[in-house]
Amino acid sequence: MTTVRTRIAPSPTGDPHVGTAYIALFNLCFARQHGGQFILRIEDTDQLRSTRESEQQIYDALRWLGIEWDEGPDVGGPHGPYRQSERGEIYKKYSDELVAKGHAFPCFCSAERLDQVRAEQMANKETPRYDGHCMHLDPAEAERRITAGESHVIRMKVPSEGVCQVQDMLRGTVEIGWDRMDMQVLMKADGLPTYFLANVVDDHLMGITHVLRGEEWLPSAPKLIKLYEYFGWEQPQLCYMPLLRNPDKSKLSKRKNPTSVTFYERMGFLPQAMLNYLGRMGWSMPDEREKFTLEEMIEHFDIQRVSLGGPIFDLEKLSWLNGQWLRELPVEQFAAEVRKWAFNPEYMMKIAPHVQQRVETFSQIAPLAGFFFSGPLQLDPALFAHKKLDATQVRQVMQLILWKLEALRQWEKERITACITQVAEHLGFKLRDVMPLMFAAITGQASSVSVLDAMEILGPDLTRFRLRNALELLGGASKKEAKEWEKLLASLG
């Protein structure tokens, strides 16, 4: 009997997302319920955005939740390497095989030509897709151009008509027309693979039997299925999980809800409660109980109990469930958890240097730095009254800073400062003009320790969360203002 093997393959390009944890949990439960193995693979082929710091954050976030893996970059295993950036020669071998078999071809089209083709297709109300310009190039000519060093990608061939039948474990048979499929790039000009080739090759070589991934990948499933067919490999069973949603049913995004696992850890949620809540996203226990452990979820797990309705990630509901867990802790464990959350040495060492020189007694620490240990702050609107900026300008400055910080990938004091400075100067203000607004939103006070240091310590999600709360207190942006301010944001670059 084949051993069930599932995997999660996150990209280390930012804070660890609750959606990643959700998919990881269901992969883990499916594997364990069938006596199988769960693998962690790192998709780091985006060399510009991938960092080892983000990779470590993924490990830390999943382990904080109690999710452990059998094989991965940090624990090793018989199917490594488990970082895609270290598997380049493997992908090249299989890319070359597809070209040799006539299932893929080198494409030399420039970005300008592709943009022109796309514009013409859209003008003619056609589905934008590659037009096959290089598909019938003479192989000798293509080889000559490659040898000469001409930039190129490798594209896969796809049928131009008919339908692909996707067998989904949750939906049954899903038919998707081939006329909706592009001739997917498999190998980029830099020699690195795209998601499609890397995932198919890795899943096959690592013996993955079941692929549970987000439903946003369902429309592109025919490309993966066709690659398995081209290689002559057995395809794993596919399961497209429903996406997490905001309470307004929109796709979960950091613009509306904190999406980083690290945020919830910093807010003081118990990992058991967080995992419990993620387990209830579209799935339920047979007896419908709301509170359960990971072990109980694994014991009773049945993938067919997953609902396709679009699970709502509701912070209020999560807080309620966390409260249930907190109140059932023995008092000694409750005290230990508080110490671990607020007064762990690593966090205290980040805060202490900024507090030590400003106090004369320990009792002065709480009024000065209590905001480091808080979630949402009780804000006084009077803190946002400004001598130079009117009420609209205050909201505009704060909204633009929030948007800039949402796009910031490396959360460092210098980069945070640069974002705020850029917005201030673009609007004709000085940095010192907007800093009181940052103090008010982030610390809830008119002055405190350096707010820029505080933002770095609090981290991106908690900082953005507080800015969002402050903006809501002040009325936020109207639809008209949001449209105008987004144009301003675009001009900032």
From Swiss-Prot:
Keyword Iron: no
Enzyme Commission (EC) number: 6.1.1.17
Cofactor binding comment, as recorded: Binds 1 zinc ion per subunit.
Enzyme class: ligase
Signal sequence, renumbered to the chain: none
Localization per record: Cytoplasm
Motif ('KMSKS' region): 251-255
GO cellular component assignments: cytosol
Record: residues binding ATP: 254
Database matches in InterPro entries: aa-tRNA-synth_I_cd-bd (IPR045462), aa-tRNA-synth_I_codon-bd_sub2 (IPR020751), aa-tRNA-synth_I_CS (IPR001412), aa_tRNA-synth_I_cd-bd_sf (IPR008925), Glu-tRNA-ligase_bac/mito (IPR004527), Glu/Gln-tRNA-synth (IPR000924), Glu/Gln-tRNA-synth_Ib_cat-dom (IPR020058), GluQ/Sye (IPR049940)
Requisite cofactors: Zn(2+)
Annotated motif 'HIGH' region, positions: 10-20
SUPFAM superfamilies, alphabetized: An anticodon-binding domain of class I aminoacyl-tRNA synthetases (SSF48163), Nucleotidylyl transferase (SSF52374)
Record's catalysed reaction(s): tRNA(Glu) + L-glutamate + ATP = L-glutamyl-tRNA(Glu) + AMP + diphosphate
Cross-referenced Pfam families: Anticodon_2 (PF19269), tRNA-synt_1c (PF00749)
UniProt cross-references to HAMAP family, sorted A to Z: Glu_tRNA_synth_type1 (MF_00022)
Assembly with partners or alone: Monomer.
Protein family (similarity comment): Belongs to the class-I aminoacyl-tRNA synthetase family. Glutamate--tRNA ligase type 1 subfamily.
Name of the molecule in the record: Glutamate--tRNA ligase
The organism of origin for this protein: Stutzerimonas stutzeri (strain A1501) (Pseudomonas stutzeri)
Phylogenetic placement of the source organism: Bacteria, Pseudomonadati, Pseudomonadota, Gammaproteobacteria, Pseudomonadales
